[in-house]
Amino acid sequence: MAKKSMIAKNKRPAKFSTQAYTRCEKCGRPHSVYRKFQLCRVCFRDLAYKGQVPGVTKASW
């Protein structure tokens, strides 16, 4: 989990567009965030297995 101060800082608009970065909406993790879902890989995997991410199914071949 990210610090509450870092999550609050990320919610404020950045002064310049280059300062903006993605964070996971669920846990606040700054690395490995899927932009389409706004979730990190850990949270994405957890929610996908539970079936809570619409349009995502387990791959089988």
UniProtKB/Swiss-Prot annotation:
GO BP field: translation
Gene3D superfamilies, sorted: 30s Ribosomal Protein S14, Chain N
UniProt GO molecular function: rRNA binding; structural constituent of ribosome; zinc ion binding
Chain sites annotated for binding Zn(2+): C24, C27, C40, C43
Top-level taxon: Bacteria
Cellular component GO terms, alphabetical: small ribosomal subunit
Keyword Nuclease listed: no
Cited Pfam families: Ribosomal_S14 (PF00253)
The entry's keywords: Metal-binding, Ribonucleoprotein, Ribosomal protein, RNA-binding, rRNA-binding, Zinc
UniProt cofactor(s): Zn(2+)
DNA repair found in the keyword field: no
Note on cofactor: Binds 1 zinc ion per subunit.
Protein family according to the UniProt entry: Belongs to the universal ribosomal protein uS14 family. Zinc-binding uS14 subfamily.
Subunit structure: Part of the 30S ribosomal subunit. Contacts proteins S3 and S10.
Annotated function: Binds 16S rRNA, required for the assembly of 30S particles and may also be responsible for determining the conformation of the 16S rRNA at the A site.
Name of the protein in its database record: Small ribosomal subunit protein uS14B
Organism: Streptococcus agalactiae serotype V (strain ATCC BAA-611 / 2603 V/R)
Lineage: Bacteria, Bacillati, Bacillota, Bacilli, Lactobacillales
